[in-house]
Amino acid sequence: RGEPEIIELANLEKEYYRLQFLVDAGNEHLKREMEVSIAAGEIVGLLYDAFYKQYANPESEHSLKSLNKLCVRLVFCLYAEDAGIFGHHGMFHDYLKGFDTRGLRKGLVDLFRVLDTKLQDRDPYLKDDNPELAAFPYVNGGLFSDENIEIPPFTDEIRNLLLEKASENFNWSEISPTIFGAVFESTLNPETRRSGGMHYTSIENIHKVIDPLFLDELKAELDEICANPVERTRTAKLRVFQRKLASLTFLDPACGSGNFLTETYLSLRRLENKILVELSHGQVTMYSASESPIQVSISQFYGIEINDFAVTVAKTALWIAESQMMKETEKILLVPLEFLPLKTNAFIVEGNALRVDWESVVPKSKLNYIMGNPPFVGQALRTKEQSKDVVDVFGKGSPETKLDYVLCWYKKALDLMKCRPQVLCAFVSTNSICQGESVPTFWKKICSEGAEIQFAHTSFAWSSESNHSAMVYCVIVGFTAKSLPAEKKLFTNGQCKLVSHINGYLLAAPDVWIASRTNNKPDWLPKIEKGSEPSDGGHLFLTPEEADCLSQKYPSLVKYIRKFTGGNEVINSKPGEVSRYCLWFLHGNPADYAKNSEICERLQAIRTLREGSSADRIRKKADEAYLFCQIRQPESDYIIIPRHSTSSRRYIPMAYTSKDIICGDSAYVLASESRYLFGILNSNVHNAWCRAICGRLGMAYRYSPAVYNNFPWPAPTEQQKAKIEQTAQAILDARALYPDSSLADLYDELTMPPELRKAHQDNDRAVMDAYGFTKGTAARTSESACVAELMKLYQQKVSAAQSK
């Protein structure tokens, strides 16, 4: 939830960066690159499908790997002819056009062999026999070295696809290697294709990681050097800075198709080209054959990737990036530079990053930055191999094994960083790692060992281009293994705020560790419990029509047919509206229903269901099929709190409910009619606390006992308490003005009635007064400041309890 940005004019020169959210970072060039890259991926997909049909055994491992390598080679050739790497434009196209469909396969095999052969090692008579083939340069780099690749026979369709759609009608030199690498890998990865299409990390999201990690600082340093008015000093510093860029080493331990590495390489080369502009002054600059004006190299980039094909794509994407930036350098220096044969190579290793010793990939003495977007998989969705990975990293029985898979990369990174504390790391991760149980379980441990968050992006939506994938909500966390004195950068909704500390909840607040099993609530507070759990397969539930029918047919059952509510009902039902009923036989007389065939049929189905359950606690309840599996129904009227609620609402909808209405386990119950309790729970203070520490389902709030039991309650005067009771009642009165509206209607930020909004605002002020958040204090106007004060109160309460 965004807060107002206040920038004093006197500080504008230093704090202008905080206005960055006003600027549209996108531009037509980036948009064009993205469109071209996605179109390129679609062309590759067509080629892939056409070739796939031609293999004798397309599902064999050898055929699939051959098909992937074939597509990578073709893409490199298509790019090389459009970028002028091979020589004249259209060279690859013209060579292929000289073959009919039957001869095209052999022509391609011959070309691949020539591209992998040094000029001095080629047949000396090749120029006479086949001058078109002999004109192709030596590529190097290992891209064409595997002669065991299986190339199937061509068809007219493939020939036309390759010559017309892929070559004549498309310009491959315009692709973005950052985007295309990921799109390409997604297009050709069978698992990804089956899951619904293309996936890639946008350039914008990559920069959310690399800009605060290192790029912003490098840009600022270069700008400062360029502003030096003394040419001799400026030139010397530019050369030192260029050597600095060439000395930096990067590791992406889950590099996929290399998009983080590729975009980082492009960013460093753009800085280097800016240096060359300053040094050359627009004049032709001569270099000897043994030296190059370019010092930044793809050999500074290291990656680990479990998928063999993605490794090949990553290397190819970096070569394409190298070629594109070399063209830019040529324009600056006004001299031609030789791209082929490939002289450098990125160090992308195929392997499981959680079982590979990272120092065997890159010596820690060389390493400066670790970054990437490791896979995030919840405990319930892990494969057996992934579960084994987690145990290998954290140890058997460790509480961290129940957390998200992505935290394994944090642990491996920190283990390396402890030996080289100057290394900085930043990962994209699921937002769950900074919520709920992850904070006291993982962050408490690593922070106690010296780790510190240097910058973070709070939760934001991360969508792929897949047609079927659900929206994912992510955070970005940049951290070190040791404390640094510098201010931290906290990004929320695209706005950056400089703060002194960022805690595990990604708040500008002190470190607090709120575990779900702790209970720090005052004695006067009612216990919070989940509603009753049916575990009945739906057989104890009735629609309104079924309830009416049973009541008329069997009057003795009327007292057992009860209204039912839960999280969905309390939010979406209108007052008095009942969408579900349930059979509630607690303390019932078996004579009323034991011989009822309709009831017995339902109970037998429940018994069978429970007997077959994998959960021991459910199997034990098979003999009590007439009862809910877990009964936690209050004996008095109660407050109902839905377990899940959308984050688009400022207040979590809560309501009073009659003890005669059965509450299910999709909501929590508080056996209380206290207006004071209701007022506090419905305040902006309690909702801010919930937003800060609760778990999430996507971005939806996941209320829990940990939120309630650890909430720091105020110590109000009798007058303040009475005021809160009045404002709480005013909320209920305002709701009652709209009997045809559900809480979902009333609490929609766009349609909230003015009477209800005013009642909540009055209640908010009354509660803040009880906390001492008086007018003019930061906690009164800023949610983050309010949460910071609540965390201080929580820490004081815990410390006081521990000292007793």
Which role fits each region the language model picked out?
Residues 178, 185, 512, 516-665, ...:
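Segments forming glycine/polar-rich beta-alpha architectures that bind adenosine-containing cofactors
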Residues 28-33, 51-61, 163-171, 186-204, ...:
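Glycine- and acidic
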Residues 1-39, 52, 61, 84-93, ...:
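Signature of N6-adenine DNA methyltransferases within the class I
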Residues 166, 230-249, 294, 341-369, ...:
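Flexible, glycine/threonine-enriched loop-and-boundary segments that flank and lead into catalytic domains
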Residues 668-710, 717-722, 726, 730-734:
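Basic, amphipathic alpha-helical recognition segments used for DNA target recognition
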Residues 90-94, 221-246, 268-299, 322-342:
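Flexible phosphate/Mg2+-sensing switch loops adjacent to catalytic phosphate-binding sites
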Residues 9, 13-267, 300, 304-313, ...:
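Preference for the N-terminal adenyl/adenosyl cofactor-binding alpha/beta module
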